[in-house]
Amino acid sequence: MNNFRITIVAFLAVLVFTTTVTNSLDEPNMDTISKSREYKCKIDLDCSNHIACRHCSYRNCKCDHGTCKCMP
C-alpha cells in the first residue's frame, strides 16, 4: 500500500511539473523594463484580437513595423 501512495505522489509531481513547463514555454517574451508582454505582429491579421485594436474597427487595425495600430 505504501508503494501505491509513492507512485501516486510521483505521478502528480511529474504532471504538475510538465504542466508548469509547458505553460511557461507558451507565454510571450516579457519586457524587463515595463514588465509588459512584448507582442510583435507580422501581418494585419495578427492584430485582429490584440488589445491595441479593441477601440478601432477590424479593417482599420494594421501591423505597422511589428506594432498593431489603428489607421485612419
Curated annotation (Swiss-Prot):
The lineage of its organism: Eukaryota, Viridiplantae, Streptophyta, Embryophyta, Tracheophyta. Belongs to the DEFL family. Keywords: Antimicrobial, Disulfide bond, Fungicide, Plant defense, Secreted, Signal. This is Defensin-like protein 286. Residues 1-24 form the signal peptide. It comes from the Eukaryota. GO terms for biological process: defense response to fungus; killing of cells of another organism. One of its GO terms (cellular component) is extracellular region. Disulfide bonds join C41-C63, C47-C68, C53-C70. It is found in: Secreted. It comes from Arabidopsis thaliana (Mouse-ear cress). Its main location: secreted.
